[in-house]
Amino acid sequence: MSSLPVAAVLPELLTALDCAPQVLLSAPTGAGKSTWLPLQLLAHPGINGKIILLEPRRLAARNVAQRLAELLNEKPGDTVGYRMRAQNCVGPNTRLEVVTEGVLTRMIQRDPELSGVGLVILDEFHERSLQADLALALLLDVQQGLRDDLKLLIMSATLDNDRLQQMLPEAPVVISEGRSFPVERRYLPLPAHQRFDEAVAVATAEMLRQESGSLLLFLPGVGEIQRVQEQLASRIGSDVLLCPLYGALSLNDQRKAILPAPQGMRKVVLATNIAETSLTIEGIRLVVDCAQERVARFDPRTGLTRLITQRVSQASMTQRAGRAGRLEPGICLHLIAKEQAERAAAQSEPEILQSDLSGLLMELLQWGCSDPAQMSWLDQPPAVNLLAAKRLLKMLGALDGERLSAQGQKMAALGNDPRLAAMLVSAKSDDEAATAAKIAAILEEPPRMGNSDLGVVFSRNQPAWQQRSQQLLKRLNVCGGEADSSLIAPLLAGAFADRIARRRGQDGRYQLANGMGAMLDADDALSRHEWLIAPLLLQGSASPDARILLALPVYIDELVRRCPQLVQQSDTVEWDDAQGTLKAWRRLQIGQLTVKVQPLAKPSEDELHQAMLNGIRDKGLSVLNWTAEAEQLRLRLLCAGKWLPEYDWPAVDDESLLATLETWLLPHMAGVHSLRGLKSLDIYQALRGLLDWGMQQRLDSELPAHYTVPTGSRIAIRYHEDNPPALAVRMQEMFGEATNPTIAQGRVPLVLELLSPAQRPLQITRDLGAFWKGAYREVQKEMKGRYPKHVWPDDPANTAPTRRTKKYS
């Protein structure tokens, strides 16, 4: 084993660990960094305490632990053990624990000092999983505040050294070049006329015919693996084994894919991107890369995760090709045009930028951090995703202001997805706890295909679900209890209230309580049910509606009876313009879904008035009797707020008036029981009621409704929201006025629209004095000819004004 490439850098690595709290190790897959190096570190006297090795994938974690134990001629659970969701294999003598990401986070939360741990290794860090980024942030916080003696080793096949070194400038970087042989990289775009699975199978079978050795085939997901395997079966010889490789397989099937083919046989390993770097698959000389991967992208607008199939990055293509050169010169066939491959993104996007962050936010709040920016991140969590996470935690009752509520603390202590944690802590009896635990186990590991009825799935007893249920019940300190299908609906409703769904039409389409659409196959037996709770949804790329993967049919009346907190009651009004009456209704709703509508028989005046106010808010202020006088009063108040801000003017914009209807309109509604009566309300007086006597006097003085011109005429001022106030007056009535009139304590000049004797505009000005001295001469000249019997003096500023339209003889 000492011939492994990473052995060459072991002395340098041990020295670095002795001298620095954080060390970066870059070593390609197959160098021995996961399956040999941890045992050497275990023997190093400079590391005091246990070693925790984080593997981001469960499949890799179990296989790494198995391999390390075999090297010691032991079984997992002795010196080397592992911990993952629903599976623990550690003993009293375990000194090296291989754990998955969520497990490491739980260990840190329960014991922030990581007592008894000397070294934490983050393996495959280049994958930049959400939990790995969180683990790094927490570990750096632990080192800084609690354990300056804790060592941290960050290992990767393609380490992003520049960014990590910026974040950890004092950390030594150890590089193992690895051992690889030349790989010939070929490119072949798939024919457009052929189905994907068939085209991939044809290309793979052709490579097997032309070349010797076992082959690793990269595919986007399990569905493609199964379909391509079926296509390949009829295209290969009896000396070729087909070995799928993905997380849901049994340990024996996974080992069959990882170990060398039997003597005289070849194998084709059909794998997802887990085989890029997480596992060393022995005996591979050929690689076929479909150049695609399936990734999850969270949509903060809908709260749903969308699975998309996309082209892999150039870094992933390089990693995939490298798997062909571990033992001897190899060949990699990329099923993509070379120019397309060269245009691919350089690196894959980190999960933290495209994931649901509700679990991360709950972990940070449990850690005592209400501002994620206070932690150390390679990429800051997106603000919009954090906002969506906060909304969900609030809906689940996990927040008290900016901190975790008592319920939120119980949820965080469980370490589950926030929705499942909320469901688990809501259990009030042992039977409810047992039911919630089984539901959580099913939703964590849902069946890949088959029945979409959660009630039917719940009736099954799969060993993995039973094992996980028992683990969750232990965390809840519950012994006993029987899982009861009659308890599923109320438990689900508390955690998935926004995913209660009502059928719309007969084609399997539903509307969710959050307003989103969802769908079942039209022939799915569930589609005959009016109401569902759909805890498992997947947002596809082809349809705006989410696909319902698992749902429970419910009787809505029974659900409302058992969970009254789900329902919001609202009294609304319908306007019957033809009859001039109001019809009041009471609606029971769950989110945006209407459960029941019933008329309000003989509502009291208070109920009717409230319904009318709700109706005004629904339809807008335009339903009220806005006379010209009322509209001008409102505009005067709006302008007063801008021009005289030192006084406490009431807010009269639409939003404010609608929000305060009870304050200014309701007191004037006594005896109003109909739409006709509502339209007869004096809105002018209602608005003036917003002002006390002193403010009314100030408004009338500083922003008057009328202006008295030199002739004594009281002429209405026209106020505008976005334009200066205007006064339309015949020019002769302004003679003798030397300066432009102003309002608002002289701060705002009136716009004068000076009219001809025929009431046609002659001039618009905000500086009357300048007009008399300047442009008036041109007006005078023209008007004398057009209106010779009217007064057009040479000195209008000092001429007596007149209402008369003719000269005296």
Protein language model annotation of sequence segments:
Residues 121-122, 250, 254, 426-447, ...:
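Charge-dense polyanion-binding interfaces
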Residues 399, 432-517, 530-706, 745-809:
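Acidic, serine/threonine- and proline-rich low-complexity intrinsically disordered segments
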Residues 686-748:
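C-terminal accessory/binding modules appended to enzymatic or scaffolding proteins
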Residues 520-521, 585, 717-718:
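Short capping micro-motif at the N-terminus of alpha-helices
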Residues 181, 518, 714-716:
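Short, isolated positions in well-ordered beta-strands
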Residues 111-126, 136, 290-294, 303, ...:
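Extended active-site and interfacial segments that coordinate phosphate-rich ligands
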Residues 1-423, 483, 538, 722-724:
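P-loop NTPase motor module signature
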